Amino acid sequence: MAEIAAELVAVEKALWSGTATAVIAETTEGEIGVLPGHEPLLGQLVENGVVIIRTTEGEKLVAAVQGGFLSVSSKKITVLADSAVWADEVDQADAEARVREASSEEEKSRAESELRAVKRSKEK
């Protein structure tokens, strides 16, 4: 199976770097799936979206991301997010409570993004 270098980087830290068979991201133009050999592009990530990385080892990595960019070149896919959290690090009960008790639309949207990431991580 074809592979490409990929990385997920948040402003505060690098979350993952390796080789991937696919990267799926929610951009302002819609959800986009990027495979090795994709045409170069630069996309803007939605404010409270989900990114999925399928590694060459067969892992499915899912993260909730808050804004940023998706950069695709012939040699590398880079997801540069303002902030990001892995789906498996999300406390689902806490996120559900934050959705109910959010004092701002931004807080609610971030918690909803985390819950979507958890849900997407459980899909095949």
Swiss-Prot record:
Function: Produces ATP from ADP in the presence of a proton gradient across the membrane.
Cellular localisation: Cell membrane
Source organism superkingdom: Bacteria
Family per similarity comment: Belongs to the ATPase epsilon chain family.
Record region (Disordered): 97-124
NCBIfam families named among the record's database cross-references: ATP_synt_epsi, PRK00571.2-5, PRK13442.1
Organism: Corynebacterium urealyticum (strain ATCC 43042 / DSM 7109)
Membrane topology per record: Peripheral membrane protein
A Gene Ontology molecular function term of the record: ATP binding
Keyword Membrane in annotation: yes
Organism phylogeny: Bacteria, Bacillati, Actinomycetota, Actinomycetes, Mycobacteriales
InterPro entries: ATP_synth_F1_dsu/esu, ATP_synth_F1_dsu/esu_N, ATPsynth_dsu/esu_N
Principal location listed in the UniProt entry: membrane
Any one annotated GO CC term: proton-transporting ATP synthase complex
Protein name: ATP synthase epsilon chain
Quaternary organization: F-type ATPases have 2 components, CF(1) - the catalytic core - and CF(0) - the membrane proton channel. CF(1) has five subunits: alpha(3), beta(3), gamma(1), delta(1), epsilon(1). CF(0) has three main subunits: a, b and c.
Keyword annotations of the record: ATP synthesis, Cell membrane, CF(1), Hydrogen ion transport, Ion transport, Membrane, Transport
